[in-house]
Amino acid sequence: MSSIQSFYFVGVITLVSSAHVYGQKKDKMNVLFIIADDMRPELGCYGIEDIVTPHIDRLAEQATVFQNAYCNIPVSGASRASLFTGVYPCYPERFTAFDANAEKDCPKALSLPECFKKNGYYVISNGKVFHNITDHARSWSEYPWRVYPDGYGKDWAEYNKWELWQNEESSRYIHPKTLRGPFCESADVSDTTYIDGRVAQKTIADLRRLKEMKVPFFLACGFWKPHLPFNAPKKYWDLYQREKIQLASNPYRPKALPKQVTSSGEIRGYGKFTTTKDEAFQREAKHGYYACVSYIDAQIGLVLDELERLGLAESTIVVILGDHGWHLGEHGFWGKHNLMNHATRAPLIVRVPHCKGGKAGGVVEFVDIYPTLCELCKVPVPEGQLQGKSFVPILQDSEKRIKEYAFVQWQGGYNIVSERYSSAIWLKGDSVVGRMVFDRQSDVAENENKVGSVSLSEEIKELETQIRIKKLQLEKKF
């Protein structure tokens, strides 16, 4: 019997034999954890009027919407590894790569799903939750489910034909080096033609199954979109008029921005790409991103509707977040991988039954999610592991604060983000080789690097001191 077959066999036995035990724990809150790849706070509930996201917005009306939530590193694998272990990234030791593996980088850490599993929960992973399907696979009650085993291991040409591009004309735009198809596609197909429609249907099926089991559950649902390529069914493209989509008002590089601030070049590896300076490209790309967000919103709506229909909504905490941000032309960038606000700030929406909710301005970061869910569900946290802080006080009162700043890292750069300032330094050894400071009170778009400002000299000095202190704390062996 193969290892995967063995895992499934054990999972089935566990499913049957645990029903009686789980059934005695009806007082426990469930968790529906929804994570979307590359989704920035470009949602109606974040004040974006152009985008169509009625289902997320509906949940947000009953939830706490965090206005200043930050990932701890702006790349998928590392961000998720940090989030699901409650441990900060640390160069070069752990959680630094796009395909970071939490088990390898931090083998002693107990993952969030495993923590719940050890405390009587049935835990399921659908879609892209951890970046790698094998990462912490045994943390789950069942082997992690994806539409395909692991797309990154497939030949790109086969991958293109099989999953991503449905229009025949798309085959004319295959990139000669990467063999990827065009960066976007509008195909007149059903929602389940693309991966995320299937992820939603699997999650709905699991909700029904879990309802029958009468178990406390942690159900994770990971959507691939709005990650590139911006492929979504045509009906979601049709929600928008391309010529009316507002383009970034600051498509230029700020003066005195450190050379270390660049962006991921992934969009250049897709067919049909021309240049980011071309307005036609900008409009098509932003249109595609919006269509993908609306597509994901519709899938989330289906899942939330089923949660309600099954009578589980009042016993289930719902979390919706993006794994980091993404530039849509701001400062000329189309991607992530930097310490600017558009790459590091992410949507975080948490609905807790019987909590009032509201818009929360206090700073939180992804390492805070693990201890928060444990506190809400009365699950003991692993001793000596978690580096974040529970934001339950904010869920109870959206005016409260739990910390002064978030700490974000990227390739030798270290960033502190408070409600007012964003300050970053780049180090080579102990020497500072790059600096940036933005006063978010007067410059929310981050268009002017204030690093040379005389009036802010004391604040800048203090922020740099805090960065160095935090960096030293994290360099201690875990």
How should these model regions be labeled?
Residues 2, 6, 21-435, 444-475:
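Formylglycine-dependent sulfatase
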Residues 8-17:
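Bacterial N-terminal signal peptides
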